[in-house]
């Protein structure tokens, strides 16, 4: 039975970043259910927008995005729609439009060979015994059993590690549903849609590489029905759909209180969405995945006497920031307050009636 310093479960942005940063400094094994290459197998349903905080993480690490990860087009504003109030506003945002699956595979490709990575693998069982973490997983057609001094759960919303550490912990969850359509809009756009009759979270749309992606986060019980109802409503706002090319869904966490952030115990640690580190106001998680991976790297390499306590303290600033997102979310999903903010016109950038489209040139009006 092989023994490692660190076993990482999940290689999304958080797990991949941590594995890369610990390579050569600790003996690391990492398990991931995605394939190493291609589009077969699991892929994360996600709008695929890289927020400024995530961009800062790459600047800090000296990384640049390869062209095959970047999607087309790059858009500089978000069309915000309040369905009940029939209001639409445009707000400037500096997101990078990416192909999420290609991004995840690229992040994995950066992990040095010194890390033992198992792609297309399934973690079956974890337990703690004799001051070691035991992990049984299936990869390459057979089951393997390893031990590790430290266990890291980077396994997302349905984290097996979080459920093992905190079996009674309850956090609000939604089903995220999105569909892909052939792009029909003359001008591509991003949008953020609020309709409290449909969900107390929000919905979105993104133009990406010739497709129009429409999705949202809905109550688990009847999410599909609510999604369909919202699509029908959006025709009043000139949204064009047609026949769906692809449909996706997954569970997404929605932290709503301070206790929803859990960092681990007994030499087991949680990073990224597994720890509840996801914005309640935007459901953006990549930046917090990268930040929590960096914080845990620093703690593990310093080896303080009480690692879990040190990690909890080190994430305090991050948790406070995310708690601020909970407060912001409550403001955005309060119909009267949202309507007042949007009607005020604060930060709204009006679009010219005759702005150029892909079918007209900027000089056609001269």
From Swiss-Prot:
Q: Which SUPFAM superfamilies match?
A: FAD/NAD(P)-binding domain
InterPro entries reported in the protein's UniProt record: FAD-bd, FAD/NAD-bd_sf, Geranylgeranyl_reductase
Q: State the superkingdom.
A: Bacteria
Q: Which Pfam families does the protein's record reference? A: FAD_binding_3
Provide the leader sequence positions.
Answer: none
Per its record, what are the GO molecular function terms?
FAD binding
Query: Belongs to which family?
Result: Belongs to the CbrA family.
Protein name, as recorded: Protein CbrA
């Amino acid at each position: 039975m092989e023994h490692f310093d660190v076993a990482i479960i999940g290689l999304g942005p958080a797990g991949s970043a941590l594995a890369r940063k610990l390579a050569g400094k600790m003996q690391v094994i990492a398990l991931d259910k995605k394939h190493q290459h291609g589009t077969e197998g699991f892929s994360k349903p996600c709008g695929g927008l890289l927020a400024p905080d995530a961009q800062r993480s790459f600047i800090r690490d000296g990384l640049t995005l390869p062209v095959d990860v970047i999607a087309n087009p790059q858009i500089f504003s978000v069309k915000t729609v309040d369905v009940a109030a029939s209001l639409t506003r445009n707000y400037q945002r500096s997101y990078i439009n990416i192909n999420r699956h290609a991004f995840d595979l690229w992040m994995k490709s950066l992990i040095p060979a010194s890390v033992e990575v198992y792609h297309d693998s399934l973690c079956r069982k974890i337990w703690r015994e004799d001051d070691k973490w035991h992990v049984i997983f299936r990869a390459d057609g057979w089951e393997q059993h390893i031990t590790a001094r430290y266990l890291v759960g980077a396994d997302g919303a349905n984290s097996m590690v979080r459920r093992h550490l905190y079996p009674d912990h309850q956090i609000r969850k939604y089903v995220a549903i999105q569909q892909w359509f052939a792009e029909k809009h003359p001008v591509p756009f991003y949008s953020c849609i609020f309709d409290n009759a449909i969900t107390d979270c929000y919905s979105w749309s993104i133009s990406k590489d010739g497709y129009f992606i429409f999705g949202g986060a809905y109550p688990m019980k009847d999410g599909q029905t609510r999604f369909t109802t919202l699509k029908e409503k959006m025709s009043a706002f000139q949204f064009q759909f047609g026949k769906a090319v692809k449909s996706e869904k997954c569970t997404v966490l929605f932290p709503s209180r301070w206790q929803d952030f859990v960092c681990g115990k007994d030499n087991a640690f949680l990073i990224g969405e597994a720890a509840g580190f996801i914005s309640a106001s935007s459901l953006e998680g990549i930046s917090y995945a990268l930040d929590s991976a960096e914080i845990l790297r620093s703690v593990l390499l310093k080896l303080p006497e009480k690692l879990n306590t040190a990690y909890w303290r080190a994430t305090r600033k991050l948790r406070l920031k995310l708690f601020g997102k909970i407060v912001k979310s409550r403001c955005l999903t309060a119909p009267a307050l949202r309507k007042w903010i949007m009607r005020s016109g604060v930060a709204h950038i009006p679009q010219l009636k005759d702005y150029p489209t892909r079918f007209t040139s900027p000089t056609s009006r001269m």
